């Protein structure tokens, strides 16, 4: 493989192993973190004739999510930014993509619950982090930008629980 000067784009398939590049941030936020083996590619090790793949034991996010500690099975760590990528097996990368899709669907449903409570259409709401590491739900009304709630606030958690319950009921109905 070519020397890595920038992160490989997510979805890049390494031709000799079939491993797929994923964002460290997405892996860290998933249930796969620490359970599914991840691999760090080192072009320098490959240049020296060594195995270029290092097994990743897990990823620890820093406060605010601006950087992450990649913890190697050999005991070392490397701090990286949120856009850095490493590699998973194709099967685990597919699991990560599926989980991300489910999370995005739940997030949209949560926004719909919050919007309904405000008497607004769901598309009127958006999630932004006006303060780094502190995402919140915003909407525009009468020329002003208003905040509905912070993500992970009690209001967000209640709306998310309502959305998850509605989703579970819908799934149960379709299974009969």
UniProtKB/Swiss-Prot annotation:
InterPro entries assigned to the protein according to its UniProt record, in alphabetical order: DUF2761 (IPR024249)
Keyword annotations of the record: Plasmid
Domain of life: Bacteria
Protein name: Protein KleF
């Amino acid at each position: 493989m070519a020397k890595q000067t920038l992160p490989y784009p997510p979805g890049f398939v390494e031709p000799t192993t079939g491993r797929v590049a994923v964002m460290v941030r997405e892996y860290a936020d998933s249930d796969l973190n620490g359970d599914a083996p991840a691999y760090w590619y080192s072009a320098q090790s490959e240049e020296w004739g060594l195995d270029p793949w290092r097994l990743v034991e897990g990823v620890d996010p820093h406060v605010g999510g601006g950087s992450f500690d990649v913890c190697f099975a050999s005991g070392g760590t490397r701090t990286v930014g949120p856009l850095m990528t490493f590699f998973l097996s194709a099967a685990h990368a597919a699991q990560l993509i599926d989980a991300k899709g489910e999370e995005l669907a739940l997030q949209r449903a949560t926004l719909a619950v919050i919007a309904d409570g405000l008497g607004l259409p769901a598309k009127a709401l958006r999630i932004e982090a006006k303060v780094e590491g502190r995402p919140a739900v915003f909407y525009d009304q009468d020329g002003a930008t208003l905040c509905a709630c912070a993500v992970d606030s009690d209001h967000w958690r209640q709306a998310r629980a309502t959305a998850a319950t509605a989703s579970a009921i819908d799934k149960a109905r379709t299974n009969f």
